[in-house]
């Protein structure tokens, strides 16, 4: 049985991007519905993140539109603090997602987006008809585990994606290999080490390592100075803090951290103590994995190591291509990412938008939400809402 539902704007995804977009539309009195496949909003934060997680950027760079963090909130907000903030945000702006909705298909027909959704609670098919559709599932739709010879068919230990990792308590005394040296990888490696696991970390590429304070200084200065000048200052501060990290297998890219982010989309890694553990020898840096047999991992440099568990902090991928049958909005590529780079990534044709795909973190989500709401408002009401949404 199918249930037909008509709405002006359909938002797919109830993470920060979906909540922010709905909130901006609600402030303009534009009808919208948010559908979410999970049982809660912000499920990546509530159900798929590790316990010690904090926002890696200062709070002023992470707040959503129209609701700054309270002045007594710590500069770097904890996981629980951010979850509470998101829940309060949804309540304040009357965002009420429909949970347990799994989008099966979406296509454009006769001036409307037709979106078929399975209500996992009732098993009914809901068919939404919307003039505008916002893909707000973001860049972190699904965890990625690379294909490694022997991993699936031979490995005798346990392997998991970083989204399944909570803390290192059950890994105490175990030999654990962390794959990936981004923020999740470095922080999980540090957490494991502090829980008395024997930790190695795979560093497959060049990486900038900075502190939260250095990043905060850099982001503040970018408002006034060229990116290359800010990069030089941040690298000087990083050199004073860490000295020569290449001695420990952490080689910096040729471009500075902020320029590298603009070019590659890859952020600097924020150190929470992992570099100190690496310098002391408590965490060993290793090269890329070549193959796995039993519990033995062979690396591309010929070295081997026996491990009990592997944690893959190897990132995420978009899930848009699974349900967007034909991109009649000319917005997404075959990998479910926008065809156009930031800042032109958020708007397609035929009323299709993307929120949270600009590789700009939470600050980018806020910009996307405001841009989308203003654009829809101008198309529906023929008015400028710039002032109303800039507060």
Curated annotation (Swiss-Prot):
The keyword Oxidoreductase applies. One of its GO terms (biological process) is response to ethylene. The keyword NADP applies. Keywords: Auxin biosynthesis, FAD, Flavoprotein, Monooxygenase, NADP, Oxidoreductase. FAD binds at residues 13-18. It is an enzyme of class 1 (oxidoreductase). Its EC number is 1.14.13.168. GO terms for molecular function: flavin adenine dinucleotide binding; indole-3-pyruvate monooxygenase activity; N,N-dimethylaniline monooxygenase activity; NADP binding. Belongs to the FMO family. This is Probable indole-3-pyruvate monooxygenase YUCCA11. The gene is YUC11.
């Amino acid at each position: 049985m199918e249930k037909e539902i008509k709405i002006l704007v359909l938002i797919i995804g109830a993470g920060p991007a979906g909540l922010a977009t709905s909130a901006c539309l609600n402030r303009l009195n534009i009808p919208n519905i948010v559908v979410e496949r999970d049982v809660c909003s912000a499920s990546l934060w509530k159900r798929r993140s590790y316990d010690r997680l904090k926002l890696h950027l200062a709070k002023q760079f992470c707040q959503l539109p129209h609701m700054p963090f309270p002045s007594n909130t710590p500069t770097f907000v904890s996981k629980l603090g951010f979850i509470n903030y998101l829940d309060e945000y949804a309540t304040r702006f009357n965002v009420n997602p429909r949970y347990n909705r799994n989008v099966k298909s979406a296509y454009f027909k006769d001036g409307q987006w037709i979106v078929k959704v399975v209500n996992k609670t009732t098993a009914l098919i809901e068919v939404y008809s919307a003039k505008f559709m916002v893909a707000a599932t973001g860049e972190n739709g699904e965890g990625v585990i690379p294909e490694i010879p022997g991993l699936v068919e031979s490995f005798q230990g346990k392997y998991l994606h970083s989204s399944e990792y909570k803390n290192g308590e059950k890994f105490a005394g175990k030999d654990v290999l962390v794959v990936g040296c981004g923020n999740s990888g470095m922080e999980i490696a540090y957490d494991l080490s502090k829980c008395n696991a024997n930790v190695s970390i795979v560093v497959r590429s060049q990486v900038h390592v900075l502190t939260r304070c250095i990043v905060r200084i850099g982001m503040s200065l970018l408002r006034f100075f060229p990116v290359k000048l800010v990069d030089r200052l941040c690298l000087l501060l990083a050199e004073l803090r860490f000295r020569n990290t290449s001695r420990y297998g952490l080689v910096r890219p040729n471009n500075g951290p902020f320029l590298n982010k603009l070019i590659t989309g890859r952020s600097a890694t924020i150190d929470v103590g992992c570099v100190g553990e690496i310098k002391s020898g408590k965490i060993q840096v290793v090269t890329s994995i070549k193959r796995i047999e039993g519990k033995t991992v062979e690396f591309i440099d010929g070295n081997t190591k026996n491990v009990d568990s592997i944690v893959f902090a190897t990132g995420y991928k978009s899930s848009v291509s699974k349900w967007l049958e034909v991109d009649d909005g000319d917005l997404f590529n075959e990998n479910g990412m926008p065809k156009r780079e930031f800042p032109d990534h958020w708007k397609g044709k035929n009323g299709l938008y993307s929120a949270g795909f600009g590789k700009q973190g939470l600050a980018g989500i806020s910009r996307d939400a405001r841009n989308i709401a203003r654009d829809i408002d101008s198309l529906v009401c023929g008015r400028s809402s710039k002032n109303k949404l800039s507060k």
